[in-house]
């Protein structure tokens, strides 16, 4: 499974990319706003750091506006993927962009039907949101299992990006279900490194070594 970093924080992207853990990056207007920088500058810098796909989202709500923005976004770098919302106008834009060879990531997906529609429209990626479904009392990971089942049944090549990841269990369950990608906030990715028994083991080894060398 590929790991994307769900952030627009350039320093964090550099940090995890240096570990060989970043296969791509996803951004959205909220993440860009947190950085307080020019949108195009941030995307351009991220694309210079990461070789893999970098999702940049359109703001327009109509298909014509989305297509116009998308054509400008892909001029930033070859690895830009245009993020499009899951709406009827969005799917119209995805179909147009797909025919032009522009890669798209359909975001804000909350049902398998939406994922299927996006794939049929020509999306390169779909992003089902698991955490937000959990927030309203639904089972976010069940959505991933449904999407993987449908895509597998028909050999659909659209890649599934598990989004709205809130904790390490989401990452593990995504991997077990065979999801192509999980896009992970850096604070959650940090947690994947940790286990109390690892810390205890290191402390024990160091204590034993110190006792051995001080004999």
Curated annotation (Swiss-Prot):
Membrane-crossing segments per the record: none
Residues at the active site: 83 (schiff-base intermediate with substrate)
The gene coding this protein: tal
Stored InterPro entries: Aldolase_TIM, TAL/FSA, Transaldolase_3B, Transaldolase_3B/F6P_aldolase, Transaldolase_AS, TSA/FSA_arc/bac
Record flagged with keyword Thylakoid: no
Domain of life, source organism: Archaea
This protein's pathway: Carbohydrate degradation; pentose phosphate pathway; D-glyceraldehyde 3-phosphate and beta-D-fructose 6-phosphate from D-ribose 5-phosphate and D-xylulose 5-phosphate (non-oxidative stage): step 2/3
Name this protein carries in UniProt: Probable transaldolase
GO molecular function: aldehyde-lyase activity; transaldolase activity
Cited Pfam families: TAL_FSA
Lineage summary: Archaea, Methanobacteriati, Methanobacteriota, Methanomada group, Methanococci
